[in-house]
Amino acid sequence: MPIKVGINGFGRIGRMVFQALCEDGLLGTEIDVVAVVDMNTDAEYFAYQMRYDTVHGKFKYEVTTTKSSPSVAKDDTLVVNGHRILCVKAQRNPADLPWGKLGVEYVIESTGLFTAKAAAEGHLRGGARKVVISAPASGGAKTLVMGVNHHEYNPSEHHVVSNASCTTNCLAPIVHVLVKEGFGVQTGLMTTIHSYTATQKTVDGVSVKDWRGGRAAAVNIIPSTTGAAKAVGMVIPSTQGKLTGMSFRVPTPDVSVVDLTFTAARDTSIQEIDAALKRASKTYMKGILGYTDEELVSADFINDNRSSIYDSKATLQNNLPKERRFFKIVSWYDNEWGYSHRVVDLVRHMASKDRSARL
């Protein structure tokens, strides 16, 4: 039987997650999306948003709308390839959402509002069994990154988990390979050159807490903060306290790139590191970590569903004589599409482990 899923927050990531599971052929087979929750419940508007996307193009599946009952004024149900998805009005308290009534088992929390564990636990009181937060979380929620530490999921302990950020999902697989293959990371600085997002301004506006963040996104390179590098220490404990970083928000609508400058724990060469990352991309990290030695630019990675695509051409070794520990690694990621696929993968992984635990 398909697992029953609800998506709280049908904005950019909520829609991308839904489209990702459709793309993977999971809708109605492994996953039954019972409901999507947002402030607006106009199914016709949701259908429009799904059909047409400036970055990712037209949705490949048929989307229509209908009414859940004759008494409602407007269509409040999406119909995608014959599968009905109810549009539910958002609530200030997740506990007030009708997950129990709808039979929802797993909630994908993508509003950006309930990222604290205690707040996200409201979904459990509303009747859901598990919650996946599609953002970094606070308050003790377990952070899981597919391909890195997803195996740490414990059905009896972890009821609210975080899928980390898109940037952590790009950086962590690279660091995971460096550690696993014995290169180690003594210390490192990460910069993400990150596409603008919906939280930014189209023209200069008010941003009291982040003055630079209030400047027009499409015409500026904007320095910003990120906790993505530090978060790697949460999923790879041996790197705890060794990584930090920053972000530059740039005038592109999608695809970002991580620049990791680090000191290895032993002498090595860029050729050895390159070979290890290439090997990992074809074996134990396949589908998570990619490898390219082509002359590619950001647009070439739109709709790439991998978490991190290592760029062999852009990687550097310090040219000082006898310096064999100082390197720069560059890796690309579609911060929308790749990340959304990992949310789907995490839900599937949890469901599989949960089923096994119940046997």
UniProtKB/Swiss-Prot annotation:
- Per the UniProt entry, what species is this protein from, by scientific name? Trypanosoma cruzi
Major localization class = other
Identify the NCBIfam families for this entry: GAPDH-I
Task: Identify the residue position(s) of the site Activates thiol group during catalysis.
Answer: H194
Which InterPro entries does the record cross-reference, listed alphabetically?
GlycerAld/Erythrose_P_DH, GlycerAld_3-P_DH_AS, GlycerAld_3-P_DH_cat, GlycerAld_3-P_DH_NAD(P)-bd, Glyceraldehyde-3-P_DH_1, NAD(P)-bd_dom_sf
Task: Note whether Amino-acid biosynthesis occurs among the keywords.
Answer: no
| Keyword vocabulary terms for this entry | Glycolysis, Glycosome, NAD, Oxidoreductase, Peroxisome
List the PROSITE patterns: GAPDH
Which EC number applies? 1.2.1.12
Record-annotated residues binding D-glyceraldehyde 3-phosphate? S165, C166, T167, T197, T226, G227, R249
Which residues make up the binding site for NAD(+)? R12, I13, D38, Q91, S134, N335
Leftover remarks: There are two identical genes that code for glycosomal GAPDH.
Motif Microbody targeting signal: list the residue ranges.
357-359
Q: What is this protein called?
A: Glyceraldehyde-3-phosphate dehydrogenase, glycosomal
The reply on keyword Oxidoreductase is yes
Subunit structure as annotated in this protein's UniProt entry: Homotetramer.
Please state which protein family the record places this protein in. Answer: Belongs to the glyceraldehyde-3-phosphate dehydrogenase family.
The GO molecular function terms of this record are: glyceraldehyde-3-phosphate dehydrogenase (NAD+) (phosphorylating) activity; NAD binding; NADP binding
Matches recorded under SUPFAM superfamilies: Glyceraldehyde-3-phosphate dehydrogenase-like, C-terminal domain, NAD(P)-binding Rossmann-fold domains
What does the record give as its pathway?
A: Carbohydrate degradation; glycolysis; pyruvate from D-glyceraldehyde 3-phosphate: step 1/5
Q: Which GO terms describe its cellular component?
A: cytosol; glycosome
* Catalytic machinery residues: C166
**What's one GO BP annotation on this UniProt entry?**
glucose metabolic process
Q: Which reaction does it catalyse?
A: D-glyceraldehyde 3-phosphate + phosphate + NAD(+) = (2R)-3-phospho-glyceroyl phosphate + NADH + H(+)
